Amino acid sequence: MYPEELVIPMKEELTENGFKDLTTPEQVVEALGQKGTTLLVINSVCGCSAGAARPGVLYSLTGDKKPDHLVTAFAGFDTEAVAEARKHMAPFPPSSPSIALFKDGELVHMIERHHIEGHPAGAIAANLQAAYEEIC
């Protein structure tokens, strides 16, 4: 498990921008069971999370269409919450960072780590904005 002093600033990059921090399996079940659209970010300490995933997600939310609910859990820190979230992200294998869009509790769009690594934040944002246009 990562030390809290390392993780908190990375969590705050999302939570200070409207994301609810999910730290328990129960919170994950409740969040993903909501009506409407829910964006789930599995946050991480890795460089591709800092350089592409988090900035890309935040930039994606500047458009007209966006998800109804924004939630996040941190891999290697919120271990039980992330394990529960990954159950809802099947059949995709565990991946962090990763970004999932749910509609009425069903997974409808997924960005895995291999889609994030080596791609700029703008590409992540464009991918998500296209999904929002279609789904939200």
Outline where the language-model segments fall.
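N-terminal leader/targeting and pre-domain segments
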Residues: 1-36, 136
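Short helix-loop-beta junction
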Residues: 6, 10-13, 58-67
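Local sequence-structure signature of Cys/Sec-based thiol-disulfide redox active-site neighborhoods
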Residues: 30-64
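Conserved strand-to-helix beginnings and helix N-cap segments that scaffold or border functional pockets
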Residues: 51-55, 82-83, 121-122
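Thiol-based oxidoreductase modules, predominantly thioredoxin-like and allied folds used
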Residues: 65-84
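Short acidic (Asp/Glu) patches
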Residues: 82-96
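Non-catalytic, surface beta->alpha helical segment in thiol-disulfide oxidoreductase systems
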Residues: 93-136
